């Protein structure tokens, strides 16, 4: 293991109609799968700022600014070893301000009920994150970290403490 990292971010929008996902077309990592409404790889100047990355991706892929989103928060961080690199995914959640319609440059956007979202074809870490969010995370405000293994992802709340 030589310590190669792949840092990625994704944003999911929730609302009365459920959760907004993107059927991504033409991606190097998650092609022809459902993912967050926008997301992608960190730029070098974003490596210490996941929010800067997700805001850039929202602008590039959706034409969306932070002022058009409510309660944008980092909710999940997952880690997975794949093809000799550590893949770190930062998942944000928020809601769109009323009346905002979106189009994506990266694929097809679809709203799904929470029940439908659990059955979507997604990359493995995103799938496990979504299952946890639907059963646990959407009912609280915790930040969760997860290690993805062959049989699932173990999620734990991340909390600040002295020491």
Question: Each PLM stretch: what is its role?
Answer:
Residues 1-21, 41-43:
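Conserved N-terminal beta-strand and adjoining loop/helix that marks the start
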Residues 7, 33, 86-92, 110:
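Short beta-strand micro-motifs in enzyme catalytic cores
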Residues 13, 91-95, 111-113:
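Short, well-ordered beta-strand micro-motif
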Residues 17, 77-100, 131-132, 136:
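Active-site-adjacent beta-strand/loop module that shapes the phosphate/pyrophosphate-binding cleft
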Residues 18-56, 153-163:
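Conserved Nudix-box catalytic region and its N-terminal flanking loop in Nudix hydrolases
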Residues 65-75:
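A short coil-to-beta-strand element that immediately follows conserved catalytic motifs
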Residues 102-132, 157-161:
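NUDIX/MutT-family hydrolases
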Residues 136-163:
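Charged phosphate-binding loop/patch that engages nucleotide di/tri-phosphates or the phosphate backbone
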């Amino acid at each position: 293991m030589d310590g190669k990292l792949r840092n990625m971010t994704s944003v999911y929008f929730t609302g009365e109609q459920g959760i907004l996902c993107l059927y991504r077309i033409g991606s190097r990592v998650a092609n022809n799968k459902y993912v967050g409404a926008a997301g992608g790889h960190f730029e070098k100047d974003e490596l210490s700022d996941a929010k800067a990355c997700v805001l850039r991706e929202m602008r590039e892929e959706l034409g969306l600014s932070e002022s058009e989103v409510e309660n944008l928060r980092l909710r999940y961080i997952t880690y997975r070893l794949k093809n000799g690199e550590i893949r770190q995914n930062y998942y944000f959640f928020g809601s769109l301000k009323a009346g905002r319609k979106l189009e994506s440059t990266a694929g097809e956007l679809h709203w799904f009920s929470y029940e439908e979202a659990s059955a979507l074809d997604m990359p493995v870490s995103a799938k496990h994150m979504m299952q946890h969010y639907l059963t646990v995370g959407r009912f609280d405000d915790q930040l969760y970290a997860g290690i993805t293994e062959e049989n699932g992802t173990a999620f734990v709340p991340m909390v600040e403490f002295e020491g």
